[in-house]
Amino acid sequence: MQSLLLLATLLGSALGGAIPSQSANYNGYKVMRVSGDDTSKISHIVSKLGLETWKFPKAANANVDIVVPPKKVAEFEKMSHAAGLKKQVMHENLGDSIKSEMSFRPYSYGGANDTWFQSYHKYEDHLKFMQDFQSAHSQNSEIVTSGKSHEGRDITGVHVWGSGEKGSKPAVVFHGTVHAREWITTMTVEYILAQLFDDKEAGAALLEKFDFYIFPIANPDGFVFTTESDRMWRKNREQNEGGCYGTDLNRNWPYKWEGDGSTTDPCSETYRGPSPGSAPETKASTSFIKGLADGAGVKMFVDWHSYSQLFMTPYGYSCSARAPNDDVLQEMASSFADAVKAVHGTSFTTGPICNTIYQANGNSVDWIVDEIKGETAFAAELRDTGMYGFVLPPEQIIPSGEETWAGVKAMFSKLK
């Protein structure tokens, strides 16, 4: 258990907080997937070499995904061989993988069609997409902002509804790109937005019951930073003491803020911030959602992340606590996973956050359930479990959207 907690502490500590003097260069970096029956050996290598981890294990023999700089490859190979670890290469050259992924197509709106979903896009183009999408559905949508980011950007979303007065039905809130490098969530959340209108039967039925508030990029500063400076950036862009930057926005929500599922190290990727709800982005989100709760109420909240193919229920702060309606939540999560698998064969694991991925205090899902009494709340980890991790090829955007939309529809079918 101690070794797992050490790995959680080490997650991204080497590269997670310092601001680079120029754009981060990942040429020659390898991403290695390792596993072994003694996780303390992996912890030792990560600590000794000061390596970044993308993913750490819940149990012995589970995978750890490690980023290895060119100058440390030889020593990593030597130490991992001596430790008897199993190894696979995820990215032979991370820099090349990023270059391929960042082949952004010029923006030309023609509706939320396959062309848009065939590549990733810059922040400004996402804003144009949302504006154009709203204009195309002007009778049943509006642009909304939950507030301002640390650097002054609007946290922009689209509010869509069916017949009747806007805001009159219970709210469904979807957040994407809370962690800046998780680009597949941006595109998948936008795919869901599009399907609410393009899937004429199912989308219309949902809009008759709920008002949807879709925020594809809940961390705009961090997302811009990933497109301009460091593709692997996770946090927001607040400056911390000691020259490190960023708060983990999914450890900063003002509920069960302190605990083993985050850290006080301002250079760590799981830095929870100086106080509960301190980040401007968190303040904006909590204030906006409280307003919805005080109105027609919050029926569902989903925080979309990547990667690992998980669909999770409360809680993150505790591995023993369960939501009052846990049986309903588990049934909904299972229906999501079953529907996803039926589309492209993609397997999702379900269960409470703490038991399924790791302990995470100060997260959005726990806050939604216990602080504003949202009826249902989930955390998703989208594709993949294969060799790509955060740098998922754009060819997987549409399949991810297709299967996720199927899962969303199935989940709503279980909602009373």
Curated annotation (Swiss-Prot):
Residues 119-415 form the Peptidase M14 domain. Disulfide bonds join C244-C267. One of its GO terms (biological process) is proteolysis. It comes from Arthroderma benhamiae (strain ATCC MYA-4681 / CBS 112371) (Trichophyton mentagrophytes). PANTHER family: PROTEASE FAMILY M14 CARBOXYPEPTIDASE A,B, SLL0236 PROTEIN. Keywords: Carboxypeptidase, Disulfide bond, Hydrolase, Metal-binding, Metalloprotease, Protease, Secreted, Signal, Virulence, Zinc, Zymogen. This is Metallocarboxypeptidase A-like protein ARB_03789. Residues 263-283 are annotated as: Disordered. Residues 18-113 form a propeptide. It is found in: Secreted. Extracellular metalloprotease that contributes to pathogenicity. One of its GO terms (cellular component) is extracellular region. Residues 1-16 form the signal peptide. The active site is at E381.
